[in-house]
Amino acid sequence: MEALKEYTRARDAKKRMFKKAKQELLSFLLRNGKSYPESGNYWTEKFFKWIKTVQFSEKWMQEALNEYLSEVYSLKAKIELMDARIREIAELEIVKDKVDKLICFSGIDVITAVETVVEINDFSRFATAAQFVSYLGLCPGEDSSGKTKNMLPLTKAGNKRVRALFCESAKAIKRTNPYGQKSKRILERQKNASPEIVAYADKATKRIRTKMKHLEERGKNYNVSSAAGARELACFVWGMMNGKIA
């Protein structure tokens, strides 16, 4: 399991490099007066078609652009290759059962499921959902003085990698259809699961989406609502992984 964890972490490192390479490319274009007409809608097929039309009169400027672009393309290709390998990992007996359950949650795709499983491995070592949430650093801190309790920001102690994964998953859940119609993607992921597992995962989706919406309606910022959604998701994941779905 340790080797699988290191491989997925290597993929994460490539993702960070990819993000930086894209930022460097955009900075180069902007400081040299080359602005994408549809600013903000970067990295689409249309964007890459546009960037191929960008030309500089000076040879070295053009070569600089080519280098920035080459780095982006190279990292993109490497990540796609590693993603394919992680999908192969998902079929290994050591992780398959857990991955198949996790992908029933809206917001948790195969890559996220594999990364979660290899990071946590034995979910039963957490006696309660609260222990699991605490391990991920998703519990608010507390400053107690006498009878007064002040809630502080998240402790952010523990496994920051899974915490980040769950925050992104919660954001994805919030974007799902609120009227009960599932996407083809989630239907495909749930098709071989038992009705009990599907019902439990769907319950999680509804609860997380409702909680995040409620918090935002109360004026809480996006990060606060995302953390709350991630906390709920962690509780549901703990239940799923420990057979407590009744």
Model-derived segments and spans:
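Glycine-rich, often acidic, oxyanion-interacting loops/wings at catalytic, nucleic-acid
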Residues: 7-101, 190-191
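Short, solvent-exposed positions on alpha-helices
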Residues: 16, 80, 111, 223-224
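Amphipathic alpha-helical segments within well-ordered protein domains
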Residues: 26, 87, 103, 117-118, ...
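Short, well-structured alpha-helical segments
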Residues: 69, 99, 103, 110-117
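Cytochrome P450 C-terminal beta-domain/meander region
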Residues: 100-106, 153-157
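Catalytic palm subdomain of template-directed nucleic-acid polymerases
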Residues: 112-128
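A basic, often C-terminal nucleic-acid-binding module that engages the phosphate backbone, implemented
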Residues: 136-246
